[in-house]
Each structure stands twice: as C-alpha cells, then as structure tokens.
C-alpha cells in the first residue's frame, strides 16, 4: 500500500517547483519516494495542474504549433481550445501529450480582432522566442480570455523566471479583469525566489470591434508597464537597503586587505 504521506510530499514539491525545474524535481522524487508513488493518480493530476498553473505551452502535433493551456481555455468536456488554429484537444494524464484532437468551428469576430492586436503588441514588446499566447472565446460565459505566457530560462547561469498574465473581457459590458504573476528564481550558491501576484480591473468599452480590441490591448499594456516600473523600484531598493548590508565586511580570512601599493612590491619577493 502506498504511503499517503509520500504522496502528499510529492504533490507539495511539484506544486512549489520553480519554472524550468520540474523535470529535475520529478527525477529526484522518483529516486526518493519511488515509482509507485509517482504513478498515483493524485500525483499525475498535480503534474497536470502544474502545466495549467504556469500557463505552459504544449505541442499541438496536429497543427505543428504550441498553444498555452489554462483552466480558462478548457470546456466542460475537458477539451482545451486553440481557436486560432480551429482545433480542440485533450491532454493525457499519464502521457502529458495532446490526445483526441478535433476540429472546431467556434469563432467570434471580436476574438479574431483581439488576437491580431495581441500579436502585434507582443511582437513589439516581448521576446517572441520565449513568449506564447492564446485568445479564447468562451461561448457559455460570453467572454474573451487572453493568456500571455513568458518562460525565460537560463539554467547555465542559475536563474529562471516567468511572466504570466490572464485577461478576461466581458463581451456584454466590456469590463476587463486581469491577473499578472511574475516569479523569478536565483539559485547560484543559494536559493532566492521572488513571487508577485497582482490584479487589475478596467474597461475596454468602445464603438466597433476594432476599437474594443485596441482599448483592451492598451489596458493590458498600461497594466503590465506599471508592474514593470514597480519591479524596477523594488529591485533597486533590495540592492541598496538589503542585499549590500549582507555582503561580507571582511574576507573569509578575517584580515583586511592592505591596499597600500607601496607595501605590495612583488619585485622584492
């Protein structure tokens, strides 16, 4: 019988793993708690949820493209939607791969205009090699969801980070609700994590679809820029007020360096 405590430990570690490190965490967990624990349905669900939480981009083999997944782009039957490619699919719990891909004809003119505006914004302001997005028309809730996912990894230099934003436009009232999460992880001779989660409310009200789309993307841009500016202030403050005082006042030997050049004549040695 599988120890429930080991299952809970595995789930917790998976949930807390920084972006870019899940593969190594799973490898370590298998060696510690064993394959039987990792094969439990609850553990596999946690791995699946990790992908949704971090707005991961999965490979859609049908369209040969990558699409961001989220609970917000999943319908009541468990299909994730990539309306830009007119396809929906499920992800196997065991395999983690795209399964049961089907064509879909759910389209919305406003969604299409928003997708084009979002693409233009991202191409201008983001590094597209690490950026993925998805624009989804939720027919049942009468809303449009915009997902922006950036996973920026430099494991050789001991850091990884992600910038995840979710925006929901109510089609009827044109109200906008947004959530932005930024997580960074530095682990060279230490373990420093920074996690930010902030919310926004606004409006994209306008005349035609083009104006609504432009207003929505402008709201996204303004909101994201405000977070970026605040982060720059935070990092400056951390460096000056908190990081510098932690640095060693003396070298490891406990002896101050003599910087008098007259006493450092190497020619006499």
Task: List each model region and its residues.
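A structural "domain/chain start" motif
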Residues: 1-140, 232, 236, 240-269
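Surface-exposed short loop/turn segments
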Residues: 108, 112, 116, 120, ...
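Short secondary-structure boundary motifs at beta->alpha junctions and helix caps
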Residues: 189-236
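Short, Lys/Arg-enriched charge-dense amphipathic segments
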Residues: 150-162, 217-222, 261-264
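Phenylalanine-focused residue identity feature
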Residues: 6, 79, 89, 158, ...
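Generic preference for flexible, low-structure residues
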Residues: 160-164, 196, 200, 254
